[in-house]
UniProtKB/Swiss-Prot annotation:
Protein name: Protein lin-54 homolog
Function: Component of the DREAM complex, a multiprotein complex that can both act as a transcription activator or repressor depending on the context. In follicle cells, the complex plays a central role in the site-specific DNA replication at the chorion loci. During development, the complex represses transcription of developmentally controlled E2F target genes.
GO BP terms in the entry: eggshell chorion gene amplification; negative regulation of transcription by RNA polymerase II; oogenesis; regulation of DNA-templated transcription; spermatogenesis
Assembly, per entry: Component of the DREAM complex at least composed of Myb, Caf1-55, mip40, mip120, mip130, E2f2, Dp, Rbf, Rbf2, lin-52, HDAC1/Rpd3 and l(3)mbt.
Low complexity biased stretches: 366-386, 500-516, 535-548, 661-682
Gene behind this protein: mip120
Biased composition annotated in UniProt, kind: Acidic residues: 10-26, 40-55
Record region (Disordered): 1-63, 366-387, 500-523, 533-552, 638-702
Length: 950
């Protein structure tokens, strides 16, 4: 998969972004101070002397098509009493929430710089009510400009920004050198910006929440939205201030409205409707560190709870920043669930991605560098990271899945625990990574997330090794799964577990494996199960409170391992036979020394209703019963055993996968089953039944049977005995020429299935849910037994030969009504035999005395029947005249003459043969007289008819 974020196209970006000029960001002031005029005059003189062609800031429009330098403009001078430096990686992540009503007129926002350092005197620049002082050397720091903030850029420039007290419009004038001019603040390419708008605050929970649709029409500052992807310097912790102060004072009538300004990658400035605090990522790396017990260095980041505006710089790891929830507000605050809906903009590699999701979208990038906090014995220096990049995949139901990855890789592997605070109860997600082959024992720090207060939940130690996979979970009615993760988790180090109350040094000192740490290792699987149950309950409660968005899904946890060098990826992985089920088991044998030669079983879960997302979870070290094998994607620990996979519907494919010895056994079992059915079909008069030997020939373990590959099914040969041959021979090859069954509801276990009735297995049939095969031998035997109980001759051949003669007859006879027994569904006609007296057919034409009609179809006889109808009409008159002469009196007189002749011969004791001859002669004489009389009558009638006609 291409994880580069540079070639991503924008999604759901249908509205064009507005372009603003520089005049839109200036405060609407009616007067211009003398200091402004003086600085502008100095700037014009300096430009003319130096030969630089710089446009006036008032006329410097950004709407021109050519690309201009990245200029940082400080718009408003409002002081925020907070200190501490935070860091952010390159490849900035821009978050923009939209969906609210656009402002009626252009509004000016205040971008506040929170980092406070000691400034130095230099030439100053005042734009609006903000004074900026620039100096190239930070050596001479004086206390005269104590109200300025120093910012150092990559190119060596030092920028001083003046800030005033929050909530006031007063500005502190800074006296600058007359020779100083206006210096353009050019942002280097490495400095990125992250702007949160529409009621967005920073939190230490490690999650990014998009605003949920609010019931109110206006958004109030203080709505909580959290961001993950930031880590403190040197693996430190981000602490929120515990003091409770008012959030933001209500603006006075003279105070102008505020807007949010975002600079895009192509140099354009975008004005965004902003009612909440903003975040500017363009600051210096923090220098102040605090020493924790055990020699671990950490950077303490303190944020003011009053506004929630933060300045971030480039980090070595992840920084978790959170502003405390305001306690007292003049304008009021709402919960995060009532924020206005919008979109989240993720920028990576110069392109923008718009994610349309009204619910929660959570990004969880892994830190690409380690810090000295976790490695207390190795003494390694923290390595720098190249930054983050984001990729986005389309999901089901309009959800866009965003995945943030880091660019570089780190060789040192650590084991850490990410704390995720909940509103109901404490949650822990354990991320497992193998220790690096550097001799440094891996450490594991478990941090609990308390739900009582945000300050208690904002402490997390997140210095982790490099992985190209991330852990995502669901909360609030939407989940962001991993796209196609197929990695295996190596076994965690023995005893690498500690409590949240222990310091980092205590957690590092407890990383040495020993025999006394077997008990914590046995309880890890139980802890994982408890975490899954808790997360499921929390996610279900959170999904109930959401107003819009896609249907909530159950959370999935993905635990992956780092992908370092090629040597680490050389562990043998063996997959079982392909299965159609949703869960696949993969057995991996680890070569690491900490595995203790025990096998680990992985579950490969692929939900069918999702968008193809795949999950894999490892269980190792703890045996489980079979009752919890398939519970939430877990399987028990089995030593040197694998479960038999379910059968595959194409049986020939399965037969090809069998070994030679299994194929021979399969064929022998099939032959026995067929022979058993044939034995039941033999006549009861057979005195010597065939014995079927249940024993199969066995071979030594080392010898393999060289059996050539045969088809899955074969036609049985007739038995050796004459009686059995007589019973099977009447089929006349019907088995080979029969048509395939097409059963859909009977599972091929009823007698109207030709395959089942003939005692054969279904082969190349179009039946559904077929049980007439060796895979369901138990069900098939049960159906055969029930049929024989009802009808002992159920499986006997329908067409048998009589004791004498060669004619074959049907045992039951056909029951045709309309076809005249000339269609193939007539069993007698299909077997090439005439219908007998047993048949109950109506209008039968399949008779022995008519060979011309026997094998012809009824359609070919339609023309013959038409000709016969014409002849029948001509003969109808003659038949009516015959009835005139053969009356009841004539027939009775003829019979009386024959009887009188018999009585006379009996009195004379004449032989029987002579008596029969005399009787027949008497009947012949009677018929001769009748015919002669009829001829006379016919001639008379013809003469009578000819006379009137003439």
């Amino acid at each position: 998969m291409d994880t580069s974020g540079g070639n991503l196209d924008s999604l759901d970006d249908t509205e064009p972004l507005p372009e603003l000029s520089f005049e839109d960001f200036l405060e609407p002031t009616s007067e211009k101070s003398s200091q402004h005029m003086e600085i502008e005059a100095l700037d014009s003189e300096e430009d003319n002397i130096g030969g630089e062609d710089l446009a006036d800031p008032a006329n410097d429009s950004l709407n021109t098509p050519q690309f201009k330098k990245n200029v940082v403009h400080i718009l408003e001078d409002k002081r925020l009493n907070s200190s501490g430096l935070t860091v952010l990686k390159s490849h900035a992540i821009k978050m923009v929430t939209a969906g609210g009503t656009p402002p009626a007129k252009a509004q000016v926002t205040d971008v506040k710089i929170l980092n406070k350092l000691k400034p130095i005197p230099s030439s100053t620049l005042k734009i609006g009510s903000t004074t900026i002082a620039t100096k190239s050397t930070p050596g001479s720091i004086t206390k005269t400009l104590g109200n300025l903030t120093q910012i150092r850029t990559k190119d060596g420039q030092v920028i001083f920004v003046q800030k005033s007290v929050p909530g006031t419009q007063s500005s502190t004038a800074v006296t600058g050198s007359p020779s100083g001019g206006i210096r353009r603040l050019v942002a280097p390419s490495g400095i990125q910006k992250a702007v949160l708008s529409k009621g967005v605050t920073m939190a230490s929970t490690g999650l990014v929440k998009a605003a949920v649709p609010a019931k109110a029409s206006t958004s109030v500052p203080g709505s909580a939205i959290t961001l993950k992807g930031i880590q403190p310097l040197a693996g430190g912790t981000a602490k929120a201030s515990t003091s409770s102060t008012t959030a933001t004072t209500s603006p006075s009538l003279a105070q102008p409205n505020k807007i949010q300004v975002v600079r895009t990658a192509d140099g354009k400035i975008i004005k965004i409707n902003q009612a909440g605090p903003s975040l500017l990522v363009n600051a210096k790396q923090g220098t102040g560190t605090t020493v924790t017990p055990g020699g671990s260095a950490a950077t303490s980041v303190k944020l003011s709870p009053s506004t929630g505006n933060v300045v971030l710089n480039k980090p070595v790891g992840q920084v978790v920043v959170r502003t405390e929830t305001p306690v007292k507000t003049a304008t009021g605050s709402v919960a995060s669930a009532s924020a206005t809906p919008g979109k989240m903009l993720v920028q990576s590699g110069g392109k923008q991605i718009l994610v349309s999701n009204k619910n929660i979208i959570k990004l969880s990038p892994n830190a690409s560098a380690t810090s000295s906090t976790t490695h207390t014995t190795g003494g390694q220096t923290p390595s720098t990271s190249s930054g983050l990049h984001a990729i986005q995949l389309p999901g089901k139901g309009g959800i866009q899945y965003v995945r943030v990855l880091n660019n570089n890789k780190s060789a040192a592997g650590t084991s850490a625990t990410a704390s995720i605070p909940k509103t109901v109860q404490t949650q822990k997600i354990t991320v497992v990574r193998p220790p690096a082959a550097t001799g440094v024992p891996a450490t594991s720090t478990t941090t609990s997330a308390a739900a009582a207060s945000p300050a208690a939940a904002s402490k997390a130690n997140l210095a982790m090794g490099n992985t190209n996979k991330i852990v995502m979970r669901s909360m609030g009615g939407s989940i962001v799964p991993l796209p196609s993760v197929q990695t295996l988790v190596s076994k965690r180090a023995l005893g690498a577990i500690s409590n949240a109350s222990k310091p980092a040094s205590a957690a590092s000192s407890s990383a040495t494996p020993s025999a006394s740490q077997e008990l914590p290792r046995k309880h890890r699987l139980t802890d994982l199960n408890v975490q899954l149950k808790q997360s499921a309950s929390v996610s279900s409660e959170a999904s109930d409170s959401s107003d819009a968005g896609p249907e909530a899904k159950k959370p999935r946890y993905v635990i992956t391992m780092q992908q370092g060098s090629q040597k680490a990826a050389s562990q043998p992985v063996q997959k079982l036979i392909n299965r159609t089920a949703n869960v696949q088991r993969v057995v991996s044998s680890s070569t690491s020394p900490s595995s203790n030669s025990t096998k680990k079983i992985y579950n490969y879960v692929q939900p069918t209703g999702s968008n193809g997302a795949k999950y894999m979870i490892c269980n190792s070290g703890v045996p489980q019963s079979s009752t919890s094998a398939m519970r939430r994607g877990y399987t028990g620990y089995v030593e040197n055993k694998t479960r038999r996979p379910p059968p595959i519907s194409p049986q020939q494919h399965r037969f090809k996968q069998m070994g030679p010895q299994q194929q021979s056994k399969h064929q022998q079992l099939q032959a026995q089953a067929k022979q058993r059915i044939r034995q039941q079909q033999l006549p009861t008069e057979q005195s010597t039944p065939i014995k079927v030997e249940p024993k199969l020939p066995t071979l030594p373990p080392g010898v393999k049977a060289n059996v050539p590959a045969k088809p899955l099914f074969e036609v049985l040969k007739p038995p050796a005995t004459a009686a059995a041959a007589g019973a099977v021979d009447p089929l006349g090859g019907m088995t080979s020429r029969r048509k395939h069954c097409n059963c859909s509801k009977s599972q091929c276990l009823k007698l109207y299935c030709d395959c089942f009735a003939n005692g054969e297995f279904c082969q190349d049939c179009t039946c559904k849910d077929c049980f007439n095969n060796l895979d369901y031998e138990v069900e098939r035997e049960r159906a055969i037994r029930s049929c024989l109980d009802r009808n002992p001759s159920a499986f006997k051949p329908k067409i048998t030969a009589p004791n004498s003669g060669d004619m074959r007859l049907h045992n039951k006879g056909c029951n045709c009504k309309r076809s005249g027994c000339l269609k193939n569904y007539c069993e007698c006609y299909e077997a090439k035999i005439p219908c007998s007296s047993i048949c109950k057919c109506v209008g039968c034409r399949n008779m022995e005395d008519r060979p011309d009609v026997d094998m012809d179809s009824l359609d070919g006889l339609m023309g013959v029947e038409g000709q016969k109808k014409d002849k029948a009409k001509n003969k109808q008159l003659n038949e009516n005249r015959a009835n005139i002469y053969f009356t009841d009196d004539v027939i009775e007189a003829t019979i009386m003459c024959m009887i009188s002749r018999i009585v006379m011969h009996e009195k004379q004791n004449v032989a029987v043969e002579d008596m029969e001859r005399e009787v027949m002669e008497e009947m012949g004489e009677s018929l001769t007289q009748i015919i002669a009389f009829a001829k006379e009558k016919q001639e008379t009638s013809q003469i009578d008819e000819s006379k009137p006609s003439s």
